[in-house]
Amino acid sequence: MKRNLCLALIVLAATLGGCAANKPGNDPSLIGSWKGVRSENGKCQFLSWKNNFKPDGTFNITFFRDAQQTQPIQTEHGIWKAANGKNELRTAGVPLPDTYTYTLIDADTVHYVSVAKDPSGDCQEDYEFTEHRIRG
């Protein structure tokens, strides 16, 4: 009986491991550090930011009051999922995710359009922005 149970557990573990291995990952072209700004003349309050999309599906983002990024406002972290031109950010402590469509302009430039956001977010307007990869 013990042997059958052990064998069943091994088969189950192998099956689940195989499913995890086939799980689609995040778009690898977004992994890394990026910076962006919200237009000063746009629909929402001006912000600039630096974010880091990690391969393990976590992110952190620091918001700044100024374009030079010397006056931090706050840092947030959470999990991200991106595939097929859709990026979803689930910030820790925020009930609903922010969702964007994205288009890669080149390896170091990505354009986003906001399509869904948590009602507690600082801007409830639809807006778009471009981020640039931070190298070095």
PLM regions with names:
Residues 1-6:
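Bacterial N-terminal signal peptides that target proteins for export
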Residues 8-15:
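Bacterial N-terminal signal peptides
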Residues 78-82:
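Predominantly extracellular/secreted and cell-surface proteins with exposed
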